[in-house]
Amino acid sequence: MPSAIGIDLGTTYSCVGVFQHGKVEIIANDQGNRTTPSYVAFSDTERLIGDAAKNQVAMNPTNTVFDAKRLIGRKFDDPKIQADMKHWPFTVVNDCGKPKIRVEFKGERKTFAPEEISSMVLTKMKETAEAYLGQSVKNAVITVPAYFNDSQRQATKDAGAIAGLNVMRIINEPTAAALAYGLDKNLKGERNVLIFDLGGGTFDVSILTIDEGSLFEVRATAGDTHLGGEDFDNRMVAHFVEEFKRKFKKDLSKNARALRRLRTACERAKRTLSSSTEATIEIDALMDGIDYYTKISRARFEELCSDLFRSTLQPVEKALSDAKMDKSSIHDIVLVGGSTRIPKVQSLLQNFFAGKSLNLSINPDEAVAYGAAVQAAILSGDKDDKIQDVLLVDVAPLSLGIETAGGVMTKLIERNSRIPCKQTKIFSTYADNQPGVSIQVFEGERAMTKDNNLLGQFDLSGIPPAPRGVPQIEVTFDLDANGILNVAAKDKSSGKEKNITIKNDKGRLSQADIDRMVSEAEKYREEDEKQREAIAARNQLEAYCFNLKQSLDGEGSSKLSEADRRTVQDRCDETLRWIDGNTMAEKEEYEHQMQELSRVCSPIMTKLHQQAAGGPQPTSCGQQAGGFGGRTGPTVEEVD
C-alpha cells in the first residue's frame, strides 16, 4: 500500500516524515536538510522553493515570499496582517477583502493567494517524500496550530488539495508533538503533559493526559497564532535600524535588500545567543558602501523581547484553568518549536512551574512532523504493534454558536469540547408570523457576536405563520475531526430543513478557484521541469566548449594545423557568446548548438586524439563537467 506522509507546514520551516518498518523516518530534502524553509521565490527565469529560494532572498527580496501561514485564512484588514506588511519586502494587495501576494514572475505581474504559496511548499515536501520512497504519494496528514480557527483550517486543507494531496486529516501541532513524545518515551501509567510549542510564527500550549502511552486525550488548548521567532527577529532588526541611523544618519528601512541582509544576520545572531552570551554581526557594504560591524548581548536581546517572552505565560495559565488543573498536577513539560531553545523562554517557564525541570528530550524541529506521520499511518490502517492501540482525542480551540436577539452569542459548542462532537438546541422566532429565520454562525469567546468571528450564515424560510416563540427551530452543530463545522437548522412543524458546511465564503476559495489553482500548479511544475532540463543542456554545452578549448592547450595539441585550431577556437567562442546572449533558450536550442559544434569540432578532435594515442587518453569532451546550477553541479549560495 502506498505510504501516507505527515507534513508539518510551518511559518518559517516545514518538515515531512513517514512511518514505515515500525518507526518514523524524518526525510531530508535534496540539500540534505531535514527541515525546508517555507519560502517561494519568483525570478525572470524560474520559480524556486525551499533552500534555493531562501539562499537568494537578499538578491531578490520583493519577489521572495515567506510567512504565507501568517496570511492564510485571514482577511486583508486584519490588524495582524496590516502590522506584518510593514516587515514584508513583498507586496500584499487587497482582493475583495482577501490578502493576495503580488510578484514579478518571468517578466509578468502575478497575484497568488496564500493557499497557492503554501501549496507550493507542500508540493516540495511531497516531492521530497517521493524521492525518498521511490513512489508517488497522495495521502497526507497536515498539521496546523491548535489555535487556528475554522477558516485557517479550511484554507490549509485547500492548499493541500492544490498541491495534489488527499488531506486525510488536519491535526493540531501540539497534539502531534504529544504523540511523538508519548510513543518515543514508552510512557507508563497516566501522565498529564503540557506541550509548549513556540515556533517561527505561532505559539500553542496544550495539556494532554496520556494513558499508558496509547490514549492521548487533549484536556485544553490555548495560544497565539501570531507570536514566534519572527517577532523576536523583528525586534532585533528594529534595534539595529535605529543604531545604524544614529551612527551613520542613514535609514535602512527604505532599502529592501539591506533590510533583508540585516534580518538574515539577526536570525543568525538570535540562534548564536541561545548558546553564547554575545553575538557579532558583520555585514560588508550594507548600505551606500558602509561596512556594518556590531555586537549584541544576550541580556540586550532579552530586554528587547521581554514583553513577548513574558506573554507566553498567559496561554499557559489559561490552559491550566480550562483543564481545571493546577501547576503541580503537570508531570511533564515538553518543549517544541525552534524558539523554545531561547534560554529566557525556558527560564520563565521553569520559574512559572516553581523550578520543575523541562523535558528537552524530543527534537523540537521534528516532533510535529513525527506525530503527523504516526497519525497518517494510523488513518491509513497500518497495524504495526507500536501504533495499533493509539487513540487520539482532540478538542475545539474556540467556542461556536449563533446570534440570537440583541446580538447575543448563544454557544452550542464550548471551547475545549472533545471533537468530533454534535450539539443541538431549540430556538424560536422573535416576531409574530415571522416567515423565516437567519442563522448566523460565529466562533469566539465574547458575549456579543460583534466581537466574535462570523463564519457564515444561511436562511431557513417557509415557517408557517405563528405567534412569536411558538415555532420550534432545531439547530445542530456538527464539528468533525478536522475541527471543521457543519450546521443544520430544521423547523419541526413544517419539516423544512437547511444545512451548510461552514465554508466561510468571504475567506474561502471556491471549488472553481481550487480547480484553477491545481491546473496552474501543474503548469508551474512542468515549467520548472523544462527549466531544469534547459539548464542541464546549457551546462553540458558550456562544459563541452571549455573542454574543447582546454584540449587546444593540452598535450599533443601542437600537432593540429593552425586552421583546425582556429576553427575550434572560433566555434567555441561563438557558441559561448551565443550562450551569454540566450540565457532563456529552450533545451532543444542548446541541443541544436551542441550538435552543430560537435559536427564541426569532433572530426578535428578525433585527429588530435589519434595523433596523441599512446599517451594518456583525454576525457570525452561530451560529458558534463559539473556546471553551475545543473542537477549534478554545485549550487552556489550567496554569502553576506
UniProtKB/Swiss-Prot annotation:
PROSITE patterns: HSP70_1, HSP70_2, HSP70_3. Keywords: ATP-binding, Nucleotide-binding, Stress response. The keyword Secreted does not apply. It comes from the Eukaryota. The keyword ATP-binding applies. Coiled coil: none annotated. It holds the Pfam family HSP70. One of its GO terms (molecular function) is ATP binding. Belongs to the heat shock protein 70 family. This is Heat shock protein 70 A1. It comes from Anopheles albimanus (New world malaria mosquito).
